[in-house]
Amino acid sequence: MTDELYLRMMLVASGCLVLTGLLLALVRTPNNELAAKFRGAKHALTLAVLLLGVFNIVQLSFDPEGDVRHLGSCIALAISSVQAMLFTNAVIVLISPSEVTLRRVLWQLGVILLVDTLLVGAYILLPLDTYLYVYELCVILYIALLVGYTHWYMRLRRQFLAQVSAYYEEEEIERSLRWLGILFWVALAVGVLSLLMLLANRTVDVCLTALLALCYAFFAACFVNYQLSMPLVLPALYQRVTPPVRNLRALTALLS
């Protein structure tokens, strides 16, 4: 792939990511107490998309043939870890708002940034051969992070289904939240595929960045559609409805 073609394709794909993030930031959300954490989740998702788009544009200034490519891999691993944290918390807050607090998010972010800072320090201070061992260890930690977030999501999803089962039929719950499961599993697949970016291969970079742009556009659409399911999810989560109401239309009428 020629330098000019690579540059153009990466700029287009990265520009689409930035545009998706900006459009998501402009989406209006209900201005009420129940939607407060939904707005926070939207901000987290917006930040994750913009973070990747801007990083890909900045990465174009790196020399892929020089030693600085290792620094690019460090930053790519850091971006992937932060994105995994943001996406997971954005999904979790929609099914278990009490599990996502500012303190927990900052704690997770602090641990991720500490590990990434140590990795960059190893790149600067240690011989290249030694640094590569540290880098491989950080890749293993990243995979462990994805496994941990998957376990967290599955546990809270089971709790959520048990919590709302008193209010709605199982089919209605599954139909309303099907997209949320798709969102998480696609995000997990993206997190795994992000490891391919560490190969520093131009063709892989272009293909994966284009795929990420499509996936994140899908994420944004799903996230916007969540507002249609909010009458189902939020009242049950916050226990604002005292009597069991097993019909979405009846519940909506009750809340209005």
Predicted regions and their residues:
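Alpha-helical transmembrane segments and their membrane-interface exit regions
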Residues: 80-87, 144-148, 214-221
